[in-house]
């Protein structure tokens, strides 16, 4: 069952049953909440005594249960991972207090309160493991062992950054790794394929002149001897595994040049014209991988491709969070590595 992408992708009730572990957790927490709520009402009305802070706890837990249902149905767990983890941790403390308030009592209503909060405590602990487990952790494949469509929280928050610069925002992926500083500015490319590259251009004026283009990747900034001086580069998903040859270019004053295509006067990008520049080589799909889960490509990012569970794809390189892949019908794009298993 393909999962819908979060962030306004609509509600899909079927996603509740797509992840078997989450299905069990949601059902157990619902049953536990009902038992605890009825027990607290009976204890408050009878001889069980006042429940005090547990009334705050029971409604906090209700808020969490409803929120988890909605986030699973919209496949938005990763987007709200931090908030959900924080409130679940708070609720875990109160659930332990709920157990302690009635576990040693001989009153049946208070025993029901303890039983209900015991179920809630178990689910809260597993939820915290699910929300905080990173992809590199040994627990990651365990908590996602029966997933058939729900995007794990760690998969959405690692290696991907969402900006709110426009309608719907822009999505950018880190291609170069860590942050740093350098002489030559930085190159950025948004998920829609448009690129911005900043650099220092030589000449008498010696000013800073930005260049714009529709290149799938940011401009490379090199010195006359080929040594890169650029700051961290951010490239579009289409250039995650670029096979472009290394060019040695001679710059103007200062020895710095840019390979990115410049913009013509009518807005169309002019083709790069550098003497001796080599053309890009075709990517070599040297690996094959099978999809562990179904995946629905983000409609706002044309570089992603969808695939079904069990589908075999050709892979260019198996490093990084996102792999350049080719489907059997010839469609190419990028896929999340945590959804794939190399053959």
UniProtKB/Swiss-Prot annotation:
UniProt entry tagged with the keyword Cell inner membrane: no
Record field: compositional bias (Low complexity): 235-245
Predominant place of localization: membrane
Region (Disordered): 231-281
Cytoplasmic side: 1-20, 74-83, 133-343
Biological process according to GO: actin cortical patch assembly; regulation of actin filament polymerization
Topological type in the membrane: Multi-pass membrane protein
Keyword Ribonucleoprotein: no
Glycosylated residues (UniProt): 107
Location(s) in or outside the cell: Cell membrane
Name of the protein this chain belongs to: High osmolarity signaling protein SHO1
Species annotation: Sporisorium reilianum (strain SRZ2)
């Amino acid at each position: 069952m393909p999962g819908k992408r979060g962030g306004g992708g609509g509600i899909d009730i079927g996603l509740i049953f797509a992840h078997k572990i989450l299905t069990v957790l949601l059902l157990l927490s619902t049953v536990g909440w009902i038992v605890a709520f009825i027990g607290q009402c009976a204890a408050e009305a009878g001889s069980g005594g006042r429940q005090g802070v547990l009334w705050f706890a029971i409604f906090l837990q209700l808020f969490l249960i409803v929120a988890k249902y909605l986030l699973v149905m919209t496949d938005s767990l990763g987007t709200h991972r931090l908030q959900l983890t924080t409130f679940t941790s708070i609720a875990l403390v109160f659930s332990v207090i709920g157990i302690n308030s009635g576990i040693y009592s001989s009153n049946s209503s208070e025993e029901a309160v303890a039983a209900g909060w015991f179920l809630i405590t178990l689910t809260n602990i597993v939820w915290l493991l699910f929300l905080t487990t990173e992809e590199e952790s040994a627990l990651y494949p365990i908590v996602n062992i029966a997933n058939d469509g729900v995007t794990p929280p760690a998969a959405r928050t690692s290696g991907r950054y969402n900006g709110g610069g426009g309608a719907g925002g822009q999505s950018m992926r880190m291609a170069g790794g860590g942050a740093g500083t350098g002489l030559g500015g930085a190159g950025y490319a948004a998920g829609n394929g448009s690129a911005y590259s900043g650099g220092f251009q030589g000449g008498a004026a010696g000013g800073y002149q930005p260049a714009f283009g529709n290149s799938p990747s940011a401009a490379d900034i090199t010195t006359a001897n080929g040594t890169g001086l650029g700051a961290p580069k951010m490239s579009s998903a289409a250039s995650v595994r670029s096979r472009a040859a290394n060019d040695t270019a001679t710059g103007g004053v200062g020895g710095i040049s840019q390979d990115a295509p410049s913009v013509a006067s009518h807005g169309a990008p002019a083709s790069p014209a550098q003497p001796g520049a080599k053309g890009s080589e075709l990517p070599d799909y040297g690996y094959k991988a099978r999809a562990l889960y179904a995946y629905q490509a983000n409609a706002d990012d044309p570089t992603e491709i969808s695939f079904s569970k069990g589908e075999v794809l050709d892979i260019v390189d198996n490093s990084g969070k996102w792999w350049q892949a080719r489907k059997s019908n010839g469609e190419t794009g990028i896929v999340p590595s945590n959804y794939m298993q190399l053959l």
